């Protein structure tokens, strides 16, 4: 009787969706200040360019790595003050999801978890370079994911014609 109850509970657990963050880590980190120290003596009127990218790969079994890349180029006038980049990664255990839910989880939910860590790593890197803190705004990864799906759908329709 107990074996049946245990096997029934195990079967129910294997059918329920599961999500677990296994590890968060910095995969790559870089900082360049090509015009230092001269840039520090200039009036500070920065313009900030931010590039954001995500990628994911399946590891063994139900484990997935998601990498969020934030690249920032800050110019003071026409000169590049600094370039900073962080690749913040995470390993996630994800199972029991249909294909659409898995795609959304990897493309929006996981990057949303990684973003605060990437933002903090980037901010720390910039301030250690003796520049003012960046204070990056939150990112709506659900909206970015929806835009990417729409772009892919339109590209597929264009290729079909």
UniProtKB/Swiss-Prot annotation:
| Matches recorded under Gene3D superfamilies | SecB-like
Q: Where in the cell is it found?
A: Cytoplasm
A GO biological process held by the record: protein folding
Sorted alphabetically, the keyword list is: Chaperone, Cytoplasm, Protein transport, Translocation, Transport
| InterPro entries, alphabetized | SecB (IPR003708), SecB-like_sf (IPR035958)
A GO molecular function held by the record: unfolded protein binding
Can you quote a single GO CC term?
cytoplasm
Q: Name one Pfam family in it.
A: SecB
HAMAP family attached to this UniProt entry = SecB
Q: Which NCBIfam families match?
A: PRK05751.1-4, secB
Could you tell me what this protein does?
One of the proteins required for the normal export of preproteins out of the cell cytoplasm. It is a molecular chaperone that binds to a subset of precursor proteins, maintaining them in a translocation-competent state. It also specifically binds to its receptor SecA.
Q: What protein family does this chain belong to? A: Belongs to the SecB family.
What is said about its interaction partners and assembly? Homotetramer, a dimer of dimers. One homotetramer interacts with 1 SecA dimer.
- The protein in question is named Protein-export protein SecB
Source species, please? Ectopseudomonas mendocina (strain ymp) (Pseudomonas mendocina)
């Amino acid at each position: 009787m107990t074996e049946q109850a245990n096997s029934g509970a195990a079967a129910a657990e294997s059918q329920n969706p599961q999500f677990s963050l296994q590890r968060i880590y910095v995969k790559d980190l870089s900082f360049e200040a090509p015009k230092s120290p001269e840039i520090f003596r200039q009036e500070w009127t920065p313009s900030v360019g931010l590039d954001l990218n995500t990628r994911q790969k399946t590891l063994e079994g139900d484990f997935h790595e998601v990498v969020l890349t934030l690249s920032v180029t800050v110019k003071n006038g026409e000169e590049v003050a600094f370039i900073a980049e962080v690749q913040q990664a995470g390993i996630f255990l994800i199972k029991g999801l249909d294909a659409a839910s898995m795609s959304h989880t990897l493309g929006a939910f996981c990057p949303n978890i990684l973003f605060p860590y990437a933002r903090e790593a980037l901010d720390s890197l910039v301030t250690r370079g003796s520049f003012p803190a960046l204070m990056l705004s939150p990112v709506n990864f659900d909206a970015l994911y929806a835009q990417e799906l729409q772009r892919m759908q339109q590209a597929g329709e264009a290729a079909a014609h």
